[in-house]
């Protein structure tokens, strides 16, 4: 039985082997291989291979229905020109144009060089500081200026129109300039002026001053015999401090206001003093309580020669007694 089964299995295997196709031998020799090494890179280049599929262009299509173009209406030519001009015009900090003739914003009016004063100087509220800017003239000031400082410059003259429209001006300080000339009406029409400082200049003559002044300092100038008008300080009822140090004065300017507290005249050329310079010779009980600070040192005057001139004073003047 086993012999018969083995015979059948052998016949099946032999039949399968006879019916199988014969395989040709494949030669991989380099001589029969057509592709060169230089063309190996092109075997994987798919850029130029045509694609059978149809290319689809992607675009945005307006929805069906109302497909009117949504373009804005053209602006009139004049309006466009104005808009272009407005965009091309530079603007300053406060929004105004630098080409405007009048500059009333926070930067103040324009100087003679067409430059805003408050860019050249420093403006804080109603105070304008123009110190040490090599100015040779007083710049145009904002109309609300109350305190003006222009020290250590090269200003040579004060014109009558420099402060003409500044009705709120209370203090002017022009220390250390080159001022030698002041127009007669430069200060007279300033209704609120309280303090005037012109020390360290070349002033030879004072103009008429407003009677509202409480503080005057014109030290270290060139005021001489005719440098101060007669009775220049008579009606200044609120004048408290008068500093005329380091000038060429040969007399004390009289009469002095009743409320004067300090009078500095040191380093002048004062030679004499009268008994009624400070006191009232007709009223021996008169006492001048306010005037406590008188400086006459540095003058050729001998204070011991006029003892009656100080009887009404709370303190003796400072000066030479020999």
UniProtKB/Swiss-Prot annotation:
Disulfide partners: 118-130, 279-312
Residues that carry a glycan: 60, 64, 96, 283, 302
Q: Which UniProt keywords apply?
A: Disulfide bond, Extracellular matrix, Glycoprotein, Leucine-rich repeat, Proteoglycan, Repeat, Secreted, Signal
Residue span of region Disordered: 64-101
What are the GO MF terms of this UniProt record?
Answer: glycosaminoglycan binding
Q: In which tissues is it expressed?
A: Cartilage, ligament, and placenta.
Matches recorded under Gene3D superfamilies: Ribonuclease Inhibitor
Task: Name the domain of life.
Answer: Eukaryota
Location relative to the cell:
Secreted, Extracellular space, Extracellular matrix
What PTM annotation applies here? The O-linked polysaccharides on Thr-60 and Ser-96 are probably the mucin type linked to GalNAc. There is one glycosaminoglycan chain, known to be dermatan sulfate, and it is probably the O-glycosylation at Ser-64.
Q: Where are the LRR repeats?
A: 144-165, 168-189, 192-213, 238-258, 259-280, 290-310
Instruction: Give the protein family.
Output: Belongs to the small leucine-rich proteoglycan (SLRP) family. SLRP class III subfamily.
Q: Briefly state the protein's biological role.
A: May have a role in bone formation and also in establishing the ordered structure of cartilage through matrix organization.
Official protein name in the record: Epiphycan
Q: Which organism is it from?
A: Homo sapiens (Human)
